[in-house]
Amino acid sequence: MYIKEMSNALEEYHAFMETQANRTVFQTPEWGEVKTDGSWTRDVLLVMADNHEPVAAAMILYRKLPGVNKYLAYAPRGIVTDYTNAEQLKSVFAALKVYLKAKNAFGLKIDPELQWREWTNKFEMVEGGFNNEEYRKNILAAGFVERPMDLGFDGIQPRLTMILPLKDEGKGIVETFNKKERYKVNVAKKQGVVCYKGTLEDMPIYDELNKITAERDQYVARSIEYLTTMYQHLHPKGMVDLYFAKVDYNVQLAFATNRLETAQKEYDKLTGQLETLNNPKRIENVQKQIESLKVNIAKYEKEIERVKGDLEQYPEGKVVSGAFVVTYLDKAYYLYGANITGDGGLNANKALVSWIMQTLYDEKGIRSFDFFGVSEDQEHHGGINGFKQSFDPELVEYIGEFDMPISKFWFEMFHTWAPKAVSLKNKILVRRKK
């Protein structure tokens, strides 16, 4: 086998990717461009068999160690190849090892998009379910060592995710949701939640939502510079969009006014009936209905005053939720999401994600929606897990992270030094938050 550099032949690279079941946006040259605007460099490679046919695709990122001419090579969610063919896999990685050694790489890290064990979306492993242990054995036999298992967000990429197959039988994707979730989406629309695509000029709006979400959920948010870079590289190629949900208070006011008018009409009707009734039980029942309507009428009047105030403050509507979704072929990844704290029960996030699904289904032929990461740690991540679970997706566990040593000395040096550097970085970030 031999390596073929594909930076100037991207159509051929993508043509091979399209034939592979474990293809992913993170192994595209376009994703590599996003990362090379920072501290990484990039290679786009095909591994060719002796008959000159491609058997593997590898978009490899390189990160230089400080002070020395040595690099960590990383194939995000890659490489893309057949992991069931053990002998071919050994040859693929043997060829890559020779190539990477010449590039002064001391090790190769992979975390392929391969499903390992079967789970329910309630975070329970299915007894007797499928177990693609063959993948793991073949990777180890090809010269890799396995990194410690992490079922949270501490890996380079999330090991657990939730994926929803998208279906529309003519009535819309929302109609495939259960009754409770359909109700939430429909109420959001009635309450004035409007969804739309943003542009690069809207990046500061997303950044504000992002800061709110990061502070609330205690994580380090992606910077506006990184998100802008991602958008600038991928949007012209049709691979990312920025989406928003806002509250149109004109719609909300009309909804609240309609509820008040309906309640007032019912109140007037019942009070008129009360004068003609003789049956004590019937009178008592109508009086209870009237009292209940009085409470609702007062509530609706108060709500109308609140909405009028919101309308005066936000005449163009208030943005309450945003999301970045990347796409490749027939798959979408819900990469980043942000929202205000407490949207008054509007379910704007639910409405936004549902609208994104339908838009991508109709416009791009997307048939699989990856929520991109959940955690087994329900105590700290129950909120985000619960939101994603509510769509009734499949919980997917990927095979994990593996490292192939190329230079044993530098490989061991890196894995001794790197955890200490990450720990120091996290301490600095915590201090900055305080």
Regions found by a protein language model. Give the residues of each.
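Acyl-donor binding region in acyl/amide transferases
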Residues: 68-154, 275, 327-391
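Short amphipathic alpha-helical segments
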Residues: 71-77, 160, 191-193
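Low-complexity, flexible helical/coil segments
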Residues: 5, 38-41, 93-98, 109-116, ...
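A conserved beta-strand-loop-helix scaffold within acyl/acetyltransferase catalytic domains
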Residues: 5-51, 55-68, 117, 143-155, ...
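Extreme N-terminal starter segment of soluble prokaryotic enzymes
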Residues: 1-3
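Juxtamembrane/interface motifs at transmembrane-helix termini
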Residues: 76, 225-228, 355, 418
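Residue-level preference for alpha-helix termini and adjacent loops
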Residues: 25, 30, 64, 78-79, ...
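Active-site/acyl-donor-binding loops of N-acyltransferases
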Residues: 7-10, 33-34, 122-169, 288-289, ...
